[in-house]
Structures are given as structure tokens and as C-alpha cells.
């Protein structure tokens, strides 16, 4: 039987929809009927494209309602569904289109969600990394799920949970009150290929990959996921601070595919720093200068150092309080601050690599060599010098701050002495602070300050990025 007929506007091709079982016969009879035209080169031989599906949306209210077709095809495109052919009835009460049969289920879900035939808007989440930040995020989602459904019509559906050893995926989602035990019992071995194949293979609409790891391997998945119309929310700062060309490519792919690549928590945990810079830039402002204290660990260390607590002890305290990395040399090297400054500079419109950042470190280079045990043995040798310098600092009523700075396109990080009249002077605990000098905020820079470390606030920042994808 003959289904739909699709004719191109240019009038140089016509497509006919038939059942898969009738495809060979249809080609045979048409090639016989048009044998003379084919022989003369007037038309090409008739060929069959198999494993396709026709979807039709029908509704009386479609008549004289502008934008229905645009909304339909825009929604399909944002979810990576390719429309092979389409037709609209002259009565304006139906639109039919052809897609790959593998995309049929996804197409139906997308249409139902977009045209409010579904009770809720759904976001399908793949959460990678369930340590301190990822675990806190899952708990925050669990606590908010019911409220978001009732008050915002948004259903957060966790369809994938991944850690370093195990991974589990299900279209039906998971019980977040018992996810660790379920992962332990039902999870498959976790590796990059499995993660990629499962997410892409599920081909599920409104998908978001949430990276709460610090893994370069996981960050290498972003490009492929974005190309398959999966949005990416990253607490992981490796990709955004990698080679500039890679950073730009990820943002370009996301824009072209109509999905999001968000990484607000790369700098300042839950503080709205990157979004603020983006808002300033998009509204026509220009970032002239950035000054910031971006390491909660280093700020904690320099706030704790005193006559009673030597430098080496403050490092140990930061490790015990889980402010620092397990290997605190990562924090002391300034690498983390350099990455954060590079990300801010790029978001502010500057093309900067990590190697371009000038470093003025306060620990000799040889302390970063050898084992961690060697470091702990050597670091007390720095205590006397730091105490002598601290006493001078105390007499001058100054504090140490490890400052990241961008000015005139040049970036630097280093230990600075700040006086009582400086905005950084009273910065407490592990807090972060950033000053933005712009064309509009030139005399009095914009200041953002608050908790810059901690699983709860970082997870909340990741959650906020997820919510922005839902436009709630």
C-alpha cells in the first residue's frame, strides 16, 4: 500500500512511503514503468531507503497557528533527530515526517514533552562521579525531586550513575535513596567505551551528562557527547582549562548542536562568577581587569598560620579538614589557581593558555619533586623563614593572600601582602573573592565573595547549571 508522498520544492525528486516488506516490489515496478526515462538519463533509478519510520502530528488547533512546524522541527533538531522528509496537509491539520526507525521512540517522547502532552518536562541525567561533590548532588536532587515536579513541572530523571569502578544505566531511572547499594550490586564495569556507548546508544531526549570527577579521561568524552546532542555540566575543570582550541571547539559544538556546555563550578564552587562575566560580556561590557583569591585551600593555610601554628602544620590541617587535595603539593603549586584564572580569562574574551600565566610561588621547586613522604619530611624546614616573615607582616598589619590577576591581557598568580584597606584583607576561612573591573565598573569594581570550597556548595552550583538547562 502507498503511504505518504514527499515532493521537494525544487521539483527534482519525489519520495514515496511504503512498508518495508513492499520496498523491493515498489522499486521493481517503478523501474519497469520508467525504464525508458532511466535509459535516457532523464531520471535516476529508483532506490529504497529502509528502516525508516513516519511520524504524524494531528490537531484541529494547528490551523492558522504560526510556529507549530518551526517548534516541531526545532525541538527535533536540538535532540539530534534528523528529519529525512516532511509534508504538511493542505487542511493544515497535520504534519508528517520521516526519521530513522532507531529515532522513533525518541521522536515521540520529544514531541509529547515539547507540546505539553506530557505532564512534566523531563531532564534525563547521567551523573558521573559520586564522591563528595557527586554524592552531595544526588542527595540534593533526591530532596528536591518532588518539589520540582509539583511546583515547576520539572522531572529530574537520573538514568545513569557512574563511578570509577561501576556504572549502571536504565531508562526507568533509579531510586536515589539507595543508589550506592544498587550500583554495587547491579553496576557493570566502568570504562570510557562503556560509558560512551551506553549514553549514545540510549539515544534519550533532553539528556545531560554531569561530570563530578577530576578525570581527564572523562573530560575527553565531552566532544562526542555534545555531537550527539547531550548537554554537559562539568564541575571538572580540565576541559575548560585545556588547550584553547579544544575549549573553543567544545563551546562551538554545543552552540551548533543546540545543547549546553556549562561549568560554573570550575571557579568559586557555587559562586556566580562565570555567569556574571558572561552576562557582562553579552550586555556589551568589557572586562579590563580581574583580581581574585580563588584557592580556598591556600586562603585557609594563610589564615591559620600564626606564632602557635607553623606553616607546615597549617598544610597538614588543610589536608585533615579536606580542604586540600590528598597530595597538598597540587594546591601549593598553584596549578589549580592557574586553571581557574585561565578559564575566567577565556570567558572574559582573552585567548590564554596555562603556560602563559606567570607564577610567583612561595615553596621552592624542589619540594614538588620526589614522594609525598619526602615532602612531609622537608616542609618543616620552611617554618622558621615563614615565621620571621609573618612577624614582619604582623607589625605592618598586613595579611598574605595568593592572588590571581589578569590585566592588559597578561595573567599571573602569586603570594601578595595586602593591607587593611584592601578588599582581600578580611577574607576568612576558605572563602573566595573576585574583583571585576570593567568599562562600566571602573571606579568601583564589582565584587563577588563567599564560600569557594566544599561539597555542598559545589554540588549546589552544579545543580543550578542543570536547572538553567531546564530554563526553570
PLM features: what roles do these ranges have?
Residues 2-6:
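Short, small-residue-biased leader/transition segments that mark boundaries at the very start
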Residues 124-130, 134-227:
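N-terminal glycine-/serine-/threonine-rich beta1-alpha1-beta2 phosphate-ribose binding loop
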Residues 304-305, 312-426, 431:
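Substrate-binding/catalytic subdomain of NAD(P)-dependent oxidoreductase enzymes
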Amino acid at each position: 500500500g502507498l503511504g505518504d508522498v514527499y515532493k521537494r520544492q525544487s521539483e527534482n525528486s519525489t519520495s514515496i512511503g511504503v512498508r518495508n516488506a513492499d520496498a523491493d516490489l515498489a522499486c521493481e515496478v517503478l523501474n519497469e514503468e520508467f525504464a525508458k526515462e532511466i535509459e535516457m538519463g532523464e531520471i535516476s533509478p529508483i532506490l529504497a531507503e529502509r528502516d525508516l519510520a513516519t511520524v504524524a502530528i494531528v490537531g484541529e488547533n494547528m490551523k492558522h497557528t504560526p510556529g507549530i512546524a518551526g517548534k516541531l522541527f526545532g525541538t527535533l533538531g536540538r535532540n539530534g533527530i534528523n528529519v529525512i522528509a516532511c509534508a504538511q496537509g493542505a487542511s493544515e491539520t497535520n504534519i508528517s515526517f520521516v526519521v530513522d526507525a532507531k529515532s522513533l521512540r525518541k521522536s515521540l517522547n520529544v514531541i509529547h514533552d515539547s507540546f505539553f502532552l506530557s505532564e512534566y518536562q523531563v531532564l534525563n541525567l547521567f551523573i558521573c562521579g559520586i564522591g563528595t561533590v557527586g554524592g552531595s548532588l544526588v542527595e540534593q536532587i533526591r530532596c528536591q525531586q518532588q518539589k520540582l515536579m509539583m511546583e515547576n513541572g520539572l522531572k529530574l530523571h537520573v538514568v545513569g550513575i557512574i563511578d570509577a569502578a561501576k556504572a549502571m544505566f536504565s531508562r526507568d531511572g533509579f531510586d536515589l535513596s539507595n543508589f550506592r547499594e544498587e550500583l554495587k550490586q547491579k553496576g557493570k564495569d566502568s570504562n570510557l567505551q562503556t560509558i560512551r556507548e551506553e549514553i549514545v546508544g540510549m539515544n534519550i531526549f533532553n539528556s545531560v551528562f554531569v561530570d563530578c570527577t577530576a578525570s581527564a579521561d572523562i573530560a575527553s568524552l565531552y566532544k562526542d557527547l555534545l555531537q550527539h546532542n547531550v548537554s554537559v555540566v562539568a564541575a571538572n575543570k580540565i576541559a575548560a582549562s585545556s588547550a584553547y582550541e579544544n575549549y573553543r571547539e567544545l563551546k562551538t559544538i554545543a552552540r551548533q548542536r543546540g545543547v549546553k556546555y556549562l561549568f560554573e563550578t570550575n571557579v568559586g564552587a557555587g559562586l556566580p562568577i562565570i555567569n556574571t562575566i558572561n552576562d557582562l560580556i553579552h550586555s556589551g561590557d568589557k572586562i579590563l581587569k580581574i583580581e581574585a583569591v580563588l584557592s580556598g585551600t591556600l586562603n585557609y593555610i594563610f589564615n591559620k598560620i600564626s606564632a602557635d601554628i607553623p606553616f607546615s602544620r597549617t598544610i597538614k590541617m588543610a589536608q585533615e579538614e579536606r580542604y586540600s587535595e590528598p597530595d597538598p603539593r597540587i594546591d601549593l603549586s598553584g596549578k589549580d589557581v592557574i586553571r581557574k584564572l585561565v578559564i575566567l580569562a577565556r570567558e572574559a574574551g582573552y585567548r590564554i593558555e596555562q603556560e602563559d600565566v606567570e607564577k610567583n610561588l612561595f615553596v621552592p621547586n624542589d619540594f614538588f619533586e620526589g614522594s609525598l613522604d619526602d615532602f612531609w619530611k622537608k616542609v618543616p624546614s620552611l617554618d622558621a623563614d615563614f615565621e620571621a616573615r609573618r612577624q614582619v607582616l604582623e607589625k605592618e598589619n598586613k595579611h598574605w593572600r595568593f592572588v590571581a590577576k589578569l590585566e592588559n591581557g597578561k595573567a599571573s598568580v602569586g603570594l601578595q601582602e595586602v593591607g587593611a584597606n584592601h578588599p582581600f584583607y578580611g577574607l576568612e576561612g576558605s572563602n573566595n573573592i573576585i574583583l571585576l573591573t570593567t568599562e562600566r565598573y571602573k571606579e568601583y569594581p564589582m565584587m563577588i565573595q563567599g564560600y569557594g570550597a566544599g561539597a555542598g556548595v559545589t554540588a549546589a552550583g552544579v545543580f543550578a547549571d542543570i536547572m538553567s538547562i531546564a530554563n526553570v
